[in-house]
């Protein structure tokens, strides 16, 4: 691997969102509202590293990846999307394709807000997933 593993994980999650979950992805971060049931974007990644003793350049990595899910149509679709994201686990074939040794994926936090300051209003939920994996640099 010649780049940060988190980029491969981000791209795998993007594929899972569109190909497996069938959700719209706001990949360019350009949409401000959505006419679809739910649109997802990845808004932040935060990572920590712990050296593995005796393994040279091995690191135990803990990646928090934050998703936003929004819709102007309804809260049910937004919450279903959050639920589906939480259900993604380390045995997902697309994550295995990355070649990254993922040890665990767990939800860390989630919240929902109802915005009424736009003409249509919308619901937005956030979800943070923690991905523990082994990396080599």
Feature-to-residue mapping (PLM):
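Low-complexity, acidic Ser/Thr/Pro/Gly-rich terminal tails and inter-domain linkers that flank the onset
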Residues: 38-46
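Charged, amphipathic alpha-helical segments and their flanking helix caps
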Residues: 1-33, 46-137
């Amino acid at each position: 691997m010649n780049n940060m593993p988190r980029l491969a994980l981000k791209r795998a999650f993007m594929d899972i969102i569109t190909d497996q979950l069938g959700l719209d992805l706001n990949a360019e971060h350009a949409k401000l509202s959505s006419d679809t049931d739910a649109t997802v974007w990845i808004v932040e990644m935060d990572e920590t590293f712990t050296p593995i003793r005796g393994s040279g350049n091995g690191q135990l990595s803990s990646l928090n990846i934050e998703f936003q899910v929004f819709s102007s149509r309804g809260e049910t679709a937004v919450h279903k999307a959050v639920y589906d994201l939480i259900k993604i686990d380390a045995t997902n074939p697309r994550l295995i394709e990355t070649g990254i040794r993922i040890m665990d994926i767990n939800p860390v936090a989630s919240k929902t807000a109802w915005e009424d300051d736009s003409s249509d209003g919308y619901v937005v939920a956030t979800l943070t997933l923690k991905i523990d994996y082994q990396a080599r640099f």
